[in-house]
Regions:
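C-terminal substrate-binding subdomain of Rossmann-fold SDR/epimerase-dehydratase oxidoreductases
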Residues: 224-306
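Catalytic helix-loop patch of NAD(P)-dependent Rossmann-fold dehydrogenases
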Residues: 105, 140-182
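Conserved Rossmann-fold NAD(P)-dependent oxidoreductase catalytic core, especially the SDR/UDP-sugar
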Residues: 113-160
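NAD(P)H-binding glycine-rich loop region in Rossmannoid oxidoreductase-like domains
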Residues: 42, 55-106
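N-terminal Rossmann NAD(P)H-binding glycine-rich loop of SDR-like oxidoreductase domains
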Residues: 2-3, 7-29
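Glycine/proline-rich active-site loop of Rossmann-fold NAD(P)-dependent oxidoreductases
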Residues: 180-184, 195-208, 232-243
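A conserved pocket-lining segment of Rossmann-fold NAD(P)-dependent short-chain dehydrogenase/reductase
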Residues: 153-158, 187-221
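Conserved beta-loop-beta element that borders a ligand/cofactor-binding pocket
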Residues: 130, 171-196
Length: 306
């Protein structure tokens, strides 16, 4: 497959669960990447340079966005330039890693700092990681019901936990800066990220105990397919501020979607005809607008009937 000319991308949080798969996918598609993180990239064979950066410190972020991607940058006369795109995944990944106030302030501050620095340095493409948790149920208090199915980007959302609220605040910062600076900022509401080995280790319990997957709306995103999504976002210009659900196509269940939801969420309205196996956290927009086509359907890796 031939890919378009690669871009220079600064990626924050690339050493985390998602980034360690997304960055190699970006490299395969011809991009060059600088990783901003507090720990090195876990795969030395990629030759990805990690610049240790505290994203909650505005000065460090501004400086990191005007840094050579590797030592080869010193070999020509061109001083460090801002990147073509910034992909911001760096954050506390969920609640209960640190106290709630720290999770909120760090995530919001980091997102603000990255967006502000990128916009003021003239970067025209910014992609930020939001979360499925904004749909309220994942870390909501008690056994909550979803508002309706499918879950899509136009729904009014009102999460109650610090992590999800921090992600919603990040979306609002992105919307405002996209308008002020006339740039593209795409916010990805990322589903439950699945690494390749987790199909064998985790999917047996996911399928046999459906109630445990309610918090994820019985949906997921393969970490490698998330890399494809990031590439599509980098390549597609001119959309301004956008929110995209970043999920794979199908429900993680033995039974077709409508039958499954009627059993597990009988009181939740279904607002349109859904595909036979369509994931409740809908990726229809990202397929229609960006052309996403999943490569890693979960049934390739785990047969629920065996």
């Amino acid at each position: 497959m031939a890919f378009p000319t690669g871009k220079r991308i600064v990626f924050t949080g690339g050493s985390g669960k998602a980034g360690r798969y997304v960055i190699p996918e970006l490299l395969k598609r011809g991009h060059s990447v600088l990783n901003l993180d507090l720990v090195p990239f876990p795969d030395p064979s990629t030759n990805i340079m990690t610049l240790k950066t505290d994203l909650t410190k505005s000065g460090e972020v501004f400086n990191a966005l005007t840094t050579h991607f590797n030592f080869a940058g010193y070999e020509n006369a061109l001083v460090p330039q801002p990147p073509d795109a910034v992909i911001h995944f760096g954050a506390y990944a969920r609640n209960m890693l640190v106290p709630d106030n720290e999770c909120f302030q760090a995530n919001v501050t980091a997102t603000y700092n990255v967006i502000e620095a990128a916009c003021k340095l003239g970067v025209k493409k910014i992609i930020i990681a939001s979360s499925e948790t904004v749909y309220e149920v994942c870390f909501g208090q008690g056994d909550l019901e979803y508002t309706s199915f499918p879950l899509d980007e136009d729904m009014d959302v009102n999460p109650m936990d610090s992590y999800a609220i921090s992600k919603l605040c990040g979306e609002r910062v992105a919307r405002g800066f996209a308008r002020r600076f006339d740039v593209d900022i795409y916010s990805l509401r990322i589903g439950n990220v699945i690494e390749p080995h987790e199909y064998a280790t985790d999917f047996p319990s996911y399928i046999s105990n459906p109630k445990t997957r309610k918090r994820n709306a019985w949906s997921y995103i393969d970490a490698r397919d998330l890399g494809q999504i990031c590439d599509l976002c980098v390549q597609r210009d001119g959309l301004g501020f956008q929110i995209f659900n970043a999920t794979n196509d199908t429900i993680t269940a033995r039974f077709p979607t409508r039958q499954f939801l009627e059993h597990w969420c009988p009181d939740t309205p279904v607002t349109r005809q859904m595909g036979m196996w369509e994931a409740p956290l809908s990726n229809a927009k990202i397929k229609d607008v960006l052309g996403f086509r999943e490569e890693h359907d979960w049934r390739k890796y785990y047969n629920p009937d065996q």
